[in-house]
């Protein structure tokens, strides 16, 4: 029972990271019906920039807002270069290829700056586990869960309580109507991409002390977060959290009780089932568009 609880704790921490990254997918989808397929590389850049700052002597807690600011700039750059031109000419696939290409470029740049070897990110908290309900849990895992929740709550608060956030919601509800009301929907979309990459960079800096940090770390995490977004629903924040936790726990328990070689299988099976029987996601709403 103790081992199972530990696996659940680790799975929840991993799942919340997936959820934060998937939350970034949701932000861009809501405003522009597009996704940043380089989201995993935004996470990687956040982790690598964070590692560089920590190695330079910057305090971990001061490093986090710097990483978020870096993510904002990186995300805005992706939207301006790769997405805005595709939206302007109403290209169905241009933004897909552009975000993938930019993700590859960021990965190659990271390899040239930091090398291809994985690096150890020093933990800001003690590495000795704590006892919780009879099982061990790492302090860093607790920080990951708390940090992920705070980030998503902060973004939701911004969307609901600020004027610019309400512009984001209006653009999501009806982009054409928002434009007629004088809302600069292009700027809103740019900001949604900036916020998306900022959340991914923040997630990268949080998860880095629990794993090895390197130029390739974002590819798998980004792909799994995309699966979480599809499983939970791209229109549901709650669905993304639930989907992330389900996938995280499924991976940790499968890896321990069966084999690490099969830890990705449950999530992929669930993804296929959701796509087959509820394409809008477990908590998502089916969109109906007039043509």
Predicted regions: what they are:
Residues 85-86, 90-161, 188, 253, ...:
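Transmembrane helix-bundle core of multi-pass membrane transporters
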Residues 14-15, 136-214, 237-243:
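Helix-loop-helix "hairpin" substructures at the membrane interface of multi-pass membrane proteins
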Residues 1-21, 49, 61-63, 89-93, ...:
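Membrane-interfacial amphipathic/re-entrant helices at transmembrane-helix boundaries
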Residues 58-102, 109, 242-247, 278-279:
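Alpha-helical transmembrane segments within multi-pass membrane transporters and channels
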